């Protein structure tokens, strides 16, 4: 909402003339603690952006009108009933062909790498971006000058929404990722090795670094306690 307001103030977006922002974005990159978080959280955004558009009439004809807070008693029980009804409606939205197509066009490529890796925490939004960019590169999709939306958020219920424009050099950069190729050559480890790595007991790398940054030390004391130091290893 804040991004939309700022876009209007700065002349970037005119809601009376321009297509809604989530349709302007060719790809929507979000923080993915698990692969399908993006598509599971987006029914609310999808509804918010479209409930006043003609296309929303077709959806309400299919799944019915959305539940509104004023239709329920202003009591703890009434609030709980509304939340349950809203959750059910969110699931109905996610099953419509319109929403499925939205996810396929704008979100699906962003979740491919995450589905092979898992939670990258603060790195997951960058992984989603790499996943989409490399997928478009491999598919031969023309993305130059397209806008992409990005959304980073945390457990404190705060989020930052911003957008980017794909630059002419994107193909040359994407060609150097080799993201999915590298993922296909990973080395599996067992539970014992994983726990030793997690607890910092294992000092030797499972796989010898090869032309990449490698963790060489976890420091020290005071403000530097837990600091992770990396070096480039040929």
Positions of PLM-derived features:
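Terminal domain-initiation and capping elements
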Residues: 1-234
């Amino acid at each position: 909402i804040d991004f939309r307001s700022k876009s209007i103030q700065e002349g970037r977006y005119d809601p009376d003339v321009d297509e809604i922002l989530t349709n302007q974005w060719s790809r929507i990159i979000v923080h993915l603690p698990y692969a399908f978080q993006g598509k599971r959280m987006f029914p609310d955004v999808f509804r918010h952006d479209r409930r006043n558009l003609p296309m929303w009439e077709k959806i309400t004809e299919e799944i019915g009108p959305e539940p509104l807070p004023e239709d329920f008693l202003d009591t703890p029980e009434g609030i709980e009933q509304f939340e349950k009804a809203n959750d059910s409606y969110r699931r109905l939205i996610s099953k419509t062909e319109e929403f499925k197509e939205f996810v396929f066009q704008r979100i699906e490529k962003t979740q491919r790498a995450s589905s092979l890796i898992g939670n990258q925490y603060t790195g997951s939004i960058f992984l989603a971006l790499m996943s989409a960019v490399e997928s478009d590169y491999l598919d031969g999709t023309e993305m130059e000058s397209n806008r992409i939306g990005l959304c980073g958020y945390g457990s404190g219920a705060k989020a930052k929404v911003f957008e980017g424009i794909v630059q002419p050099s994107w193909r040359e950069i994407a060609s150097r990722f080799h993201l999915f190729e590298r993922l296909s050559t990973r080395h599996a480890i067992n539970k014992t090795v994983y726990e030793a790595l997690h607890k910092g007991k294992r000092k030797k790398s499972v796989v010898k670094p090869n032309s990449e940054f490698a963790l060489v030390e976890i420091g020290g004391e005071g403000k530097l306690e837990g600091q992770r130091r990396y070096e480039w290893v040929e």
